[in-house]
Each structure stands twice: as structure tokens, then as C-alpha cells.
């Protein structure tokens, strides 16, 4: 438990660098751009992991793996967990390392997608009821992990951009929802078309893994 607390502890201030005014300004602008890029691209890839099931619903129904009622329950599990998680994780994000917190959420979300793909591949030897329950649990876990995305991203933007610029950059950040849906339907949809819905979950998991690395490298607390 202590190791977990230490891992998510708020970072100590970085060592002071001896730079002239021009170099300092250039360095500051680079860090700001990296933080904005990580928040926006990272949250876009959060959306890929969140909306992947929407891309897979029709192929899953066509394959007879699950019916519409079961898919409705699975989707509701994500929404319920996401709603509760937004309330809880918004508070937690204020007291922890936002870079690691946001990256953890995306890695967990990607893992949930990957496990959905594994379950899909193994469905022929697993009872349908077990597949349904496992999907609901995994998608609920995904919903909770998804709630770990927005709070750290918004905190980062508020730290790096003053009030006179914050609205502009937050407006660009808000487009990450649409960007993520575009990535999901284009990238994941293409994978589903050529390799099946199970592979689609692996594709969204790969996108989440990429996003987690971007956040760890560029989202400066």
C-alpha cells in the first residue's frame, strides 16, 4: 500500500535550471505544448477505448455471440461505473500525480478492451452466460477507468495556461471527444472490417497503450 501511495504521490518540483531568458521562455513553451498535446491526444485515445464497443455491436449481433438486451446491459455497466467514477476520481486527481493517474486509467481501459478480445476469441468454449457476465464486468471496469481521464487533463491545462489563454486551449481540448470518435470508427472500424470484431478490441487496446505512453512522456504535472 505504501508503494502505491508513493507511486501516485504528487511530484516534487523539478530541479531549477540555469537558463537565460530566451532559453527559459523557449523551454517553458515546449513544456506547455507537450502538456497540451498529451492531454488532448491522450484523452482522444481514451475515447477510442470507450467507444470501441459501439463499433463492434453490429458484428457481435450478426455473429449471434450476444443479443441486443445483453449488449444494452453491458453498455449500461460502463455508463454507471463512469458516472460514479467521475465523482470519486475527480477528488482523487487533486491529490495525486496526474501524469501517472491519467496513464493508469488508460492502461486499465486498454487492458479491459484486450480482455474483451480474448473472451471473444474463446467464446466457442465458454457458455454464453459466462461471456455476457464477463463482458459486463470488463466494460464496467472500463467505465471506471475512463473516469480517470478528464480530471487530470483539465488540471494539467489549468496549471500550464493562464486565465487569458485557458478558454482557447480548453476549446481545442474539448475537440478530443470528436477526435477520439473519429479515430475509433476509422481505425477500429477498419480492423473489424478486415479481421473481425475480436481483433477490433485488440486494436483499441493498442491505441490505449500508445496513449498511455504519450501521457507518461509529455503530461507534465
Task: Identify what each model region corresponds to.
Residues 34-66:
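Extracytoplasmic
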Residues 85-97:
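Helix-to-loop junctions at the C-terminal end of transmembrane segments
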Residues 107-128:
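C-terminal ends and interior cores of transmembrane alpha-helices
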Residues 112, 127-148:
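Hydrophobic core of transmembrane alpha-helices in multi-pass small-molecule transporters
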Residues 138-178:
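Cytoplasmic helix-loop-helix junction between adjacent transmembrane helices
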Residues 173, 177-220:
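Helix-loop-helix hairpin linking two adjacent transmembrane segments in secondary transporters
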Residues 51, 79-87, 181-182:
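Residue-level signature of mid-helix packing/kink "hotspots" within the transmembrane helices
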Amino acid at each position: 500500500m505504501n508503494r502505491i501511495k508513493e507511486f501516485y504521490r504528487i511530484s516534487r518540483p523539478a530541479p531549477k535550471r540555469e537558463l537565460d531568458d530566451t532559453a527559459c521562455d523557449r523551454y517553458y513553451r515546449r513544456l506547455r505544448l507537450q502538456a497540451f498535446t498529451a492531454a488532448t491526444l491522450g484523452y482522444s485515445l481514451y475515447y477510442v477505448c470507450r467507444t470501441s464497443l459501439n463499433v463492434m455491436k453490429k458484428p457481435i449481433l450478426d455473429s449471434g455471440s450476444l443479443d441486443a438486451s445483453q449488449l444494452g446491459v453491458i453498455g449500461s455497466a460502463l455508463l454507471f461505473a463512469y458516472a460514479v467514477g467521475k465523482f470519486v476520481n475527480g477528488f482523487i486527481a487533486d491529490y495525486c500525480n496526474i501524469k501517472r493517474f491519467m496513464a493508469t486509467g488508460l492502461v486499465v481501459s486498454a487492458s479491459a478492451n484486450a480482455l474483451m478480445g480474448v473472451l471473444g476469441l474463446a467464446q466457442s468454449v465458454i457458455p454464453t452466460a459466462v461471456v455476457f457476465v464477463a463482458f459486463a464486468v470488463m466494460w464496467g471496469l472500463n467505465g471506471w477507468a475512463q473516469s480517470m481521464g478528464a480530471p487530470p487533463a483539465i488540471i494539467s491545462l489549468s496549471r500550464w495556461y493562464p486565465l487569458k489563454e485557458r478558454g482557447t486551449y480548453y476549446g481545442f481540448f474539448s475537440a478530443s471527444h470528436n477526435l477520439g470518435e473519429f479515430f475509433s470508427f476509422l481505425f477500429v472500424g477498419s480492423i473489424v472490417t478486415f479481421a473481425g470484431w475480436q481483433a477490433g478490441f485488440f486494436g483499441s487496446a493498442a491505441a490505449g497503450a500508445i496513449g498511455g505512453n504519450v501521457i507518461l512522456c509529455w503530461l507534465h504535472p
